[in-house]
Design a protein with these regions (language model features):
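Structured-RNA-binding interfaces characteristic of tRNA pseudouridine synthases
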Residues: 1-255, 263-270
């Protein structure tokens, strides 16, 4: 079948969804998008994503690709995203849809991803961020947290910070190129960037860093926890609702990609 391939950038509020994937129980974001495509293009059966976000996790830069039968595509390319959004719920939006090379694959061509995690560090929660940030009311030592964050940069086995799932690859080794902590008012933003991530890895890292800031995990022990490859000795898993898949990187350099696309504001500067 002669098809046209499109690269999609998708944003969604993950609160109401059981993650990205189509689910046997509950609803995945993928299911809603495929249903929208099905109403417009009966020949489209599936979209392929760059990532699989977990239940309650959000996205501003999920990338996917889709192949549309050429015979069914009767609109200007620029109208595709608008047309899809007309069939999507308000908590899912296609930000862009552009033609992609025939060989492009959203997952296998990705060179890295950036996640951001938001914490509201004040005794009173900001009600506007209730579903977007983890409320942690205890005072935190940011200097120790930043020092600990630097220890994650580089190539490591991240087994100590990840959950387990049957689809995980045999290797737990990943390379992080960035692990920063920014502060804007009462909001803390963790920026974690790397070539790939294990299941719940970002949330395990953030939970551990918060416990370092709280004084429950000594800074001196973080390197030992990383080397232990034992989830039981690391910190807690941060809640899902503070995590956002911010960006997926492809062939161009990560810095130029990040500069070329501005993201919607999410309650504070990163």
């Amino acid at each position: 079948m002669d098809t046209l391939k499109f690269k999609l950038v998708i944003a969604y509020d993950g609160t109401a969804y059981q993650g990205w994937q189509v689910q046997k129980i509950g609803t995945g974001v993928q299911e809603k998008i495929e249903a929208a495509f099905g109403r417009m293009f009966p020949g489209v059966k599936r979209i392929h994503s760059s990532s699989r976000t977990d239940t309650g996790v959000h996205a501003l830069g999920m990338v996917a690709h889709v192949e549309i039968p050429r015979a069914e595509f009767k609109m200007p390319d620029a109208r595709l995203a608008l047309a899809l959004n007309a069939f999507l719920p308000d908590d899912i939006r296609v930000l862009s849809a552009v033609r992609a090379p025939k060989k492009f694959h959203a997952r296998f061509d990705a060179t890295g991803k950036q996640y951001r995690y938001y914490v509201w560090n004040h005794h009173a929660m900001n009600p506007l961020l209730q579903k977007r940030a983890w409320h942690f009311p205890v005072k935190l030592d940011l200097a120790k947290m930043r020092a600990a964050a630097k220890l994650f940069i580089g190539k490591h086995d991240f087994r100590s910070f990840a959950g387990t799932r049957s689809y995980e690859m045999a290797s737990n080794v990943r390379t992080l190129t960035r692990c920063d902590l920014k502060k804007s008012g009462e909001q803390l933003t963790f920026i974690i960037e790397g070539d790939g991530f294990l299941y719940k890895m970002c949330r395990g890292i953030v939970g551990t860093l918060v416990q370092v800031g709280q004084g429950k995990i000594p800074l001196a022990k973080v390197a030992d926890i990383l080397a232990s490859r034992d989830r039981r000795v690391a910190g807690m898993t941060a809640p899902a609702h503070g995590l956002v898949l911010w960006k997926v990187f492809y062939q161009r350099s990560q810095k130029s990609e990040a500069r070329s696309q501005k993201r919607p504001h999410t309650g504070g500067s990163a």
